[in-house]
Amino acid sequence: MSIELDLQLAVENEQGLPTEQDIQLWLDKTIPQFQENAELTVRIVDTQESHQLNHEYRGKDKPTNVLSFPFEAPPGIELDLLGDLIICRQVVEKEAEEQSKPLLAHWAHMVVHGSLHLLGYDHIEDDEAEEMESLETEIMQSMGFEDPYILEK
């Protein structure tokens, strides 16, 4: 099993961010359930970059917590490249505070959530959302975190 992380920190202030080891652990607890080897980029950004990408790719004129950009290899070519996760520091921090969650737990949840998107999971339809949230809860609890959706239940 090999999950290769390319961590990019595109923020003005790197203090208080999860460590590369934290992010690697979260990926190692998520991805191997679905595929043995993977390579992905996790880019932590400030509000401006998140806002710009969310507007350009999703038509939403605001920053968001996590954006997932799956990589699709051309037909006949097999690569372990999953894609890119773009996580907005300020949105994650604000959500953690608003939801009274430990900040590290919310960072972990965003990495798990985004990774599942890269693996093909979605939450547009209710049944898809239920399956994805169930997986997220299971993975988060396996790492010692609370159910990230506990406030919604």
From Swiss-Prot:
Pfam families: YbeY. Its main location: cytoplasm. Its cofactor is Zn(2+). Binds 1 zinc ion. It is found in: Cytoplasm. InterPro entries: MetalPrtase_cat_dom_sf_prd, YbeY, YbeY_CS. GO terms for cellular component: cytoplasm. It comes from the Bacteria. Signal peptide: none annotated. Zn(2+) binds at residues 113, 117, 123. It is an enzyme of class 3 (hydrolase). Its EC number is 3.1.-.-. Single strand-specific metallo-endoribonuclease involved in late-stage 70S ribosome quality control and in maturation of the 3' terminus of the 16S rRNA. This is Endoribonuclease YbeY. It comes from Vibrio atlanticus (strain LGP32). The gene is ybeY.
